[in-house]
């Protein structure tokens, strides 16, 4: 689908918006431990991979795309923020198509962060139960090609999107749902 978008719109009209909570902090931590104990970074350490823009820059370079390239790190909403921005870029006429989505890997850094927030479940995840007691972490990736019109027969429609902040709590929205309603 990326190649179809390139053929239809050209490389300068395709953007990239990708999100990630943790951009390689685990690898950076290991590399810095090696530096302080052994006096040098491991030979396979790539400082560029630690940059906040790494995932979007990587995809842009892989496909030689010349459109806007943005990365998002807004915790759990990183991928959603990327998809929303992609939609806005298309609606504004900045891009004709945008590669959007996100990727996250399991890492001790993220696990410890959620554990310090007391957000990790003590048992199997039960998100829709009134007895839920937290989340279970995983890893994954999902990438979409959003475009101003159909590229192929597998096209879907993004019917709407929104973002808001209820300024309540990092992991617990207002119980009345007003933050979600505002979005």
Language-model features: locations:
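Active-site-proximal gating segment of KS-fold condensing enzymes and close homologs
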Residues: 20-70
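Condensing-enzyme catalytic core mediating Claisen C-C bond formation in acyl metabolism
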Residues: 124-183
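Conserved active-site "lid/cap" helical segment
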Residues: 1-18, 24-25, 183
């Amino acid at each position: 689908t990326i190649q179809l978008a390139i053929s239809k719109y050209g490389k300068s009209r395709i953007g990239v918006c990708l999100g990630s909570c943790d951009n390689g902090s685990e690898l950076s931590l290991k590399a810095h431990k090696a530096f302080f104990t052994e006096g040098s970074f491991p030979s396979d350490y790539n400082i560029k991979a630690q940059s906040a823009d790494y995932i979007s820059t990587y995809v842009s370079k892989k496909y030689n795309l010349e459109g806007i390239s943005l990365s998002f790190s807004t915790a759990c909403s990183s991928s959603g923020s990327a998809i929303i921005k992609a939609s806005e870029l298309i609606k504004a006429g900045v891009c004709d198509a945008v590669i959007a989505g996100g990727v996250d890997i399991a890492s001790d850094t993220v696990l410890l962060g959620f554990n310090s927030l007391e957000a990790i479940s003590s048992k199997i995840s039960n998100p829709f139960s009134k007895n839920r007691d937290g989340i279970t972490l995983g890893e994954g990736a999902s990438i979409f090609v959003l475009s101003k019109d159909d590229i192929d027969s597998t096209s879907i429609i993004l019917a709407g999107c929104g973002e808001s902040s209820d300024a309540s709590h990092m992991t617990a929205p207002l119980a009345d749902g007003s933050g979600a309603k505002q979005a």
